[in-house]
Amino acid sequence: MERREHTYGYEDAAGVTPPPWTGSAVGLMDLDAFFASVEMLDHPEWRGKPLIVGGDAESRGVVSTCSYEARRFGVHSAMASAEARRLCPQAIWTHGHFDRYREVSAQVMAILADETPRVERVSIDEAFIDITPGRFAPEDPLFVARRISDRVAALGVTCSIGVGCNKTVAKIASERDKPFGLTIVRPGTEQRFLAALPVSAMSGIGRSAEERLRRMRIYTLGELSRAPESTLASIFGVNGERMRQRALGLEISEVTSLDEERKIKSVSNERTFAKDLTERGDIEAAIALLGESVGRRLRRQGLTGATVTLKLKYSYGSGRSAQRRLPHPTDDENIFIAVALELLDNIWQEGMHVRLAGIGMSDFDHQGGIQTDLFCEVDDRGAQSSDRRDLSVAIDAVRDKFGDAALTFGRQSRFND
């Protein structure tokens, strides 16, 4: 496969050398159909064929990822396996091997770290890099990105890379020419690059936000960038102006290095309620909602924690917390939420009014990930089961694409603060 390469604003300027890069240069490296690509690396006979990595249709599994050949039939991540089998009955199915994916991911991350000290892993198959000339890279970002692309391809998998002045531009650029694409958005061309794109192209705008923007007759990022600040604030609050700045290509974002990631001591989420919670069912639902956010952040950062902390503050101002150590590190919210609900008995009794609740994970295994096969069952509490990890990955994918409200669980419907 030949790499597709574009330098935005200079596609039709044959022989014209773009001016030197000024300011920050952020890249987003995204491995193409990563799980499926690794399976094809280990099974060359599967190359060029529709391949699906996921759970069985018979056991109501879901698709974790699939090859581009399968995507042509309408199969996509987070789809029910039964529907995927109906759309593409000729597909090859595999249950995947997470240890192997971690191994290849580590090789790719090592390449990035060799090119720049500023590498921020977003997930097992995606990372931001700071390749600002003269700061973290010795040459123009185009040459650094080309070299990374070539070095990753030499491992037997491909990646798509977008480069721009900030994370928003880099992320959108990385999706322009998948698979095996390289898109460079030179300084000064950001607004032209973004203007015609639909608002959904920008991360953080899910289905609900997109619908509200449509009601305002805002369909493109260009229209969003021209919307009055007061109008956006009336609908989205303080996030409205941030959305507008991102649509203008003016986001200021810093890439966090791997060393800085390893300094993270805990990942937590807490919320102060407009009205005190007094019913156990409502408190449990709030803890579950907060715990889901923590689990998703752990998976994004490749972290697994071994200590669960539950924190409550009461209406009269005082608060209490409780901790428990798990037998195995995990990023599975089903495991640590269940433990947090057990801890609730230690710090809450009927009649107490809860003003704030928080849940956190700490004591991280910085190797990241679950040290078991992606789709095998493990019975001990703290080691994540395969079906749950499959489901967690699928839910993350749906929420990343359609927003957090796209999928909720029944117990959370009780919590409607």
Task: Identify the meaning behind each predicted range.
Residues M1-Q245, L258, R296, G382-D417:
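Gly/Gly-Pro- and Ser/Thr-rich, intrinsically disordered tail segments characteristic of DNA damage-repair
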Residues G15, P19-P20, A201, A209-V354, ...:
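DNA-contacting surface of Y-family translesion DNA polymerases
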Residues F34, A57-R60, S315-G319, F364-Q367:
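Short, charged/polar surface micro-motifs in flexible loops or helix N-caps
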Residues V122-E126, G164-K167, L303-T307, M352-L356:
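Short Gly/Ser/Thr- and Asp/Glu-enriched loop/turn motifs at secondary-structure junctions
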Residues A127-P133, R320-R324, F375-D379:
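Short, hydrophobic beta-strand segments
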Residues H328-D417:
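Acidic, metal-coordinating catalytic segment for phosphate/diphosphate chemistry
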